[in-house]
């Protein structure tokens, strides 16, 4: 797992940064990647192509004025070739993205899909609806674009990255360069009806002031070895939380030794 924290990243997301410094940081990343990653080359088509892409990006960073945000975007695209969800850059923090806008929206992954987990109270009848298209594009198309800009090693990673980043304006504009100031979702409701939902981009404060309605979900992490919780009112869907799995032999040995409080 490689999650580099480079010194310049304390700067504002939009503060212009020295090109030589950006190139130097990226060169360091490439060196560490080649030295520590179990397979840094295959996703690029081989060692030669890995270094070829690294060379071009380093030169681009050196000659083109950039910010923390543009550095993050370009290097994330480079790292996405690894198809490794454990190797990525941490994005700029919210405090460093003063002008960032958001959707009043929370989504979550289900098997082969994404559903609405939290939305403004005005649309609470749409909670739990499955997203079928985003701004007119199929979920498959959007997932493919997500994989091209954020490292993901499998389909679940793509879903997770999309769910985590979808409420942020910067990510949405990477997916939809022609996007206006709102996002349109085509939905399939739990009772099988086709509906649409258009949400505007809002400031962080506006999102915080928006009354939201949420689906039931796992309420909190627990320190119990094994715990479960129903997430629907009919008690048909359960979440199970297992903190760790111990070998049976360990318990049998301790039991034979007369030790108590094993569970």
Residue ranges and their predicted role:
Residues 14-263:
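Flexible, low-complexity junctional segments that flank or bridge functional domains
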């Amino acid at each position: 797992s490689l999650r580099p924290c480079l010194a310049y990243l304390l700067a504002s997301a939009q503060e212009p940064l020295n090109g030589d410094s950006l190139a130097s940081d990226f060169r360091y990343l490439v060196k560490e990647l080649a030295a520590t990653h179990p397979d840094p080359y295959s996703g690029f088509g081989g060692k030669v192509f890995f270094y070829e892409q690294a060379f071009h990006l380093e030169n681009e960073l050196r000659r083109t004025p950039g910010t923390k945000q543009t550095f993050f975007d370009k290097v994330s695209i480079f790292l996405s070739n690894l198809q490794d969800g454990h190797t990525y850059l941490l994005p700029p923090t919210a405090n460093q993205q003063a002008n960032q806008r958001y959707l009043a929206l929370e989504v979550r992954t289900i098997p082969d899909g994404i559903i609405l987990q939290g939305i403004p109270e005005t649309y609470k009848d749409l909670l739990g609806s499955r997203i079928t298209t985003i701004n007119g594009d199929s979920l498959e198309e959007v997932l493919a674009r997500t994989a091209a800009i954020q490292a993901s090693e499998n389909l679940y990673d793509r879903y997770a990255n999309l769910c985590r980043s979808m409420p942020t304006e910067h990510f949405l504009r990477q997916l939809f360069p022609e996007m206006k100031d709102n996002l349109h979702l085509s939905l399939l409701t739990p009772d099988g009806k086709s509906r649409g939902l258009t949400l505007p981009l809002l400031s962080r404060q506006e999102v915080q002031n928006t009354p939201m309605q949420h689906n039931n979900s796992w309420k909190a992490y627990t320190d119990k070895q094994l715990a479960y919780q129903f997430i629907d009112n009919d008690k048909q869907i359960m979440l199970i939380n297992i903190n760790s799995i111990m070998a049976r032999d360990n318990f049998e040995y301790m039991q034979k030794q007369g030790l108590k409080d094993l569970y």
